Amino acid sequence: MAVTVETLEKLERRITLILSADTIKNEVEMRLKRLAKTVKADGFRPGKVPMSVVAQRYGYSVQYEVMNDKVGEAFSKAANEAQLRVAGAPRISEKEGAPEGELAFDATFEVYPDVKIGDLSATEIDRVSTEVTDAAIDKTLDILRKQRRTFAQRAASEGAVDGDRVTIDFEGKIDGVPFDGGKAEGFQFILGEGRMLEAFEKAVRGMKTGESKTFPLQFPDDYQGKEVAGKEADFLVTLTKIEAQHLPEVDEAFAQSLGIQDPTLEGLRADIRKNLEREVKNRLIARNKSAVMEALIKVADLDLPKALVQNETDRMIEGARADLKQRGIKDADKAPIPAEIFHEQAERRVRLGLVVAELVRTNQLQAKGEQIGAHIEEMALSYEKPEEVRRWYFGDRQRLAEVEALVVENNVTEFVLSKAKVSDKQLPFDELMV
């Protein structure tokens, strides 16, 4: 087989493949003979169908299959001999003017780019850290108490205050006309928790059971309901029930109800601290990793293979369709999703993937077995049944591959931070946890 390689624009290459027509013909005949042993046809015993009938029925499909296989083999061999790192599948087209007894094909494709990474020591990156304070533990305790609160109906003479669970009937109109979502009966919400617009809650605050009130409400310009955004509505609200909340005391009985190993107040706070520190650690890793990846994108110079960008765009479109399907959208598989909306993000992902791969390759940052095991062990110990979590990960290659990818990203993050010009900054707990 003779091979010629042409360099086209940037990453694009073309290989001309020359195949022997006899090789194709012999392979087709061999496959047809093999097929004839199992073919069934009316009027013939199994395996006794004449070759002429087999060729007439299956000749075209077998020849197509053989051509695909042989061209694919020839392309792989030629690319390997030329030491080309092929990015994406080649476009194959038959070429005219081949010598007698031969077939010629052009394979047009892209190769992976040379990735040039700038001076990491001159790259500035902010590395954040966060401390789990007593105030953070107190706030978590308040959340746990609210999750276990009970409610008791208030006396008819008492007005609604923040923390109460109120039940209301309401109807809203714009210019005297009702609108979708503007009417409900027996609607419940906790006053003061921000589920409703502040102006709505302000109007309900202080109302008593059985009381009705009419008030205007201005919808924000960025309100999620586009049909009412920026408009003023008039609401009629009737308060049918007020229930005062009762928060459990933070005592040993409360600690026991949470099922912690040391059901004392000290044990409860220690358990909360441990969980918060684990969550803070994971969020800091993600945040600092994001800062590193953003820096890598800026410091790297490379051309992007169009095929890889297209493949990533296609994956993102399929992901969007799967999301629509999960939400119950009819005919989600056929939803027209413009590729342009994902193009920029797809380019970013491909660029970052190539840069990370280059760093891993040139600095031996591959995930080690003990790193993968330690990562899984850390996750497993955060669950009630660690052994089940271990089995869940180690029993599936795809899950292990996902953990391996995370470990590689962490290795890259640590490597870049060790080389870059890092500024350490303290981030408030609440800001990190948003």
From Swiss-Prot:
Function recorded in the entry: Involved in protein export. Acts as a chaperone by maintaining the newly synthesized protein in an open conformation. Functions as a peptidyl-prolyl cis-trans isomerase.
Family to which this protein belongs: Belongs to the FKBP-type PPIase family. Tig subfamily.
Signal peptide: none
Chief location of this protein within or outside the cell: cytoplasm
Reactions listed under catalytic activity: [protein]-peptidylproline (omega=180) = [protein]-peptidylproline (omega=0)
Keyword Transit peptide annotated: no
Domain notes: Consists of 3 domains; the N-terminus binds the ribosome, the middle domain has PPIase activity, while the C-terminus has intrinsic chaperone activity on its own.
One annotated GO biological process: protein unfolding
PPIase FKBP-type domain segment(s): 163-248
Listed Pfam families: FKBP_C, Trigger_C, Trigger_N
UniProtKB keywords: Cell cycle, Cell division, Chaperone, Cytoplasm, Isomerase, Rotamase
Annotated InterPro entries: PPIase_dom_sf, PPIase_FKBP_dom, Trig_fac, Trigger_fac_C, Trigger_fac_C_sf, Trigger_fac_ribosome-bd_bac, Trigger_fac_ribosome-bd_sf, Trigger_fact/SurA_dom_sf
GO CC list: cytoplasm
EC number(s) reported in the record: 5.2.1.8
UniProt xrefs under HAMAP family: Trigger_factor_Tig (MF_00303)
GO MF annotation terms: peptidyl-prolyl cis-trans isomerase activity; protein folding chaperone; ribosome binding
Subcellular location: Cytoplasm
Name of the protein this chain belongs to: Trigger factor
Source organism, top-level taxon: Bacteria
SUPFAM superfamilies assigned: FKBP-like (SSF54534), Triger factor/SurA peptide-binding domain-like (SSF109998), Trigger factor ribosome-binding domain (SSF102735)
